[in-house]
Every structure is written in C-alpha cells, then in structure tokens.
Amino acid sequence: MPLEVVVELQIRAISCPGVFLPDKEVVYLGVYLLNQYLETDCFPSVFPIVIQQSMRFEKVFEEAMDPGAVAELLESFLTRFELVQLVSPAWEELAYYEKNTRDFLFPEPKLTSSHLGMQREVLMKTAIWFPGIAPKLEFSTRTAILECVFPCKNRFLWEERCKLQQSFSKLNGPANNRKKKPKEKNSDQLSKGTPFWGPSPQRLHLHRPTQRNPGKSFRFLGERKPPFVVRHVDSGNPFGENNLEHHSQKSRRKPKFINFDLAKKRAFSLDSLEANIKVVREPDERIVLRSQSPPPLNSGHFRKPLLNHQGDVDFHPETTVTTSQLSSPPSPLDHSLLQERFQPCSASMWQKIQERACSLLTPNRAHPKEDSISETNSIHERPSYLLRKHLLREHRYF
C-alpha cells in the first residue's frame, strides 16, 4: 500500500535583537515544504515578529512500501523559509533558510535539545543589504508516516478499483462453489447409479442406441414389432426375398443389437422365426396359375439365394432345407391344395393386399428377374407336407 507523510508545522516567532528595518512596510513568512507553498499573515516590520500560526503539509508516495524508502525519497525534496517585505513596486526578500526535507524533519540529535522537534531554532541567511545580524526562526514540527488507502490525487480512480475488486471477488466466490457442487453431485450419482445400468436389459435396449445415434431413435422403437407376422406380397418380388436380404443386411450392420432383440421379437410374434419365414415364402395364386408348365430347372439359379443369406446365421437351417427340397419333383397335391386355399379370397381382397405390400416394400431393393423366376420354381416344387403342416397357422393372418 502507498505511504503518506503528514507534517504539522507550528511557527512561533522571528527574533532579531537590535535590528531596525529601513522600510516600514509589512512583512510575512513564506514556507515551501513537500512541494507546497504556504504564507503567514502580514505583520509590522518590527522585531521580534510574533507569528503563532500552524500549517499542515501532506504528501503521498505511491511507490514507497516502507518508511525507509520514504526517508530516502525525502532527501530529494527541498524545504525553504522566506522572510519577505512588501516594498513598492514589488516585494523584497530580507532573509531565507533552506535544507533537504529529510534533514529538516528528522535532524540529528544534539546536546542542547531536550525535546526533539518540539522547540526548534534555526538561523536564517540574510541578504547583502540587510542591516544587522541574522534573524532567528523559532518553530516546532511533528511528522507522521501513515498507510494511505487511496492516493489523494487519484482518489476517485482508486475507489473505483476497490469497488471492481470487491465485485469481482463476490462474483467469483459463488461461481467456484457452484462449479464444485455439480461435480460432486455427478460423482455421487455415478457411484450410486452404475450398479443398476448393467443387469437391466430394458435400459440397455432404450439407452444404448440413443447414445450412438440419437437422431434415429424412432427407427429403433419401430423394430419392436415382429417383421413377418402379416403376409405381404409384392408383384415384383412375391416371395419376400427382398425382406430376407434386407433383414440380413440389417443384422450385419447392427450385430450387437440383433442378438439382444431376437428374444423380444420372438415373444411378440405368434410363431417362431422359422415358421414366419415359411409363411412369407408361400406362393401367390397368380404365380401358381402362371407356372402350370414350369421351365426346366437350372441348378445355378438355386445357389444365388444361398449365397445371399450366407452371412446370416439365423437363416442357415432354412436355406439348407429349401435346397434339399428343390431336388424332389413337384407333387400334384400342391396345385389342388393351393387352389382350394386361395379360392375363398376375392380379387378385391388380393388387390388390397398387393397395394399394401407395395406401399410397405417400396424402399427395398428389387431383385433380378432370374432370381424371382428361380424362386417361383423352387416354391412350386416344394413338397406338400410343409403346406399341410402350417395350414392352420396361415389362416389366422388373413
């Protein structure tokens, strides 16, 4: 903090015995101390001149941090006393006294002075034309070095700085406490909540996809429904090969979630996944009537569906059964059973089913024409015991 020097000067009198001034004009005493100049009142030019006045001088040292530094700085300041007479047309200096401020305020101790600073006397230097001996100045000083809260010159700036520092400390204090509290709360919540995240499959099912891809969370919720509960027929792809291939690609993209959702999908569906696949692969009436005279079978066409579903583990048993059954000749009972099954359905009913299937299966990729023909031939040549086995289950879907 800056230090301030306060000096109280008490001037008693100026004595010069046996001296008479030639001019009768009034005189006064001027004091220059700590870069400040003060004057006493005017008195008659007759010695002794009794003044009996007090003066106060103040000076702030902003760079000083201790009284020793202040004492060193006081050596560079000058203290001067002037005895002036107001002679016309101007003023005239009769005598003067000057010294550095440190020696003036803190003089060396002497044997004659019993009370330092209380009663002091100094001899002034006279001018050339002054008649008589040098006048003597009687005074007393009292000096104090204080800690200054704000500089006198920059008082308002110093007050603004103090206000800003106080407001800044008030703002930073609660902010630090607020920042620390959420961290502690989060650590407590993590320590308490971590044991419950692991064993719960519903939380894992709901929260893990939203963390990886939160924008597509609605798609994940839509996958709860069984994919093959209702039979959908597409004119371009009647046997659902596109659905199976799309399902296999989706299982490759999300291998972590398909194993977890498989049990839930089986619980929602009426039949097992194998039965649903068989239901989807059942032929359409138009295909059966169109393929009364099937073309010669080609073994190259039947290997393509097997290669398409080779990456999906769940469909390996079904594909092996279909390829083994393709070698058996078509049974005449298939045509009769299919005709009996599809006779009750009207043309309008089939048209609605086809429109609904087309609207649902539009984003799927269309298969080549050869694959669809090969699939129709494979379904046409399927043995009859598969249809008899799932006949009762198929009626409930319509």
From Swiss-Prot:
InterPro entries in the record: SPATA6_fam (IPR042769), SPATA6_N (IPR032732)
Entry superkingdom: Eukaryota
GO molecular function, one term: myosin light chain binding
Keywords: Phosphoprotein
One GO term of the biological process aspect: spermatogenesis
One Gene Ontology cellular component: sperm head-tail coupling apparatus
Region (Disordered): 170-215
One Pfam family this sequence matches: SPATA6
Modified residues (Phosphoserine): 269, 272
Family: Belongs to the SPATA6 family.
Identification of the protein by name: Spermatogenesis associated 6-like protein
Provenance organism: Rattus norvegicus (Rat)
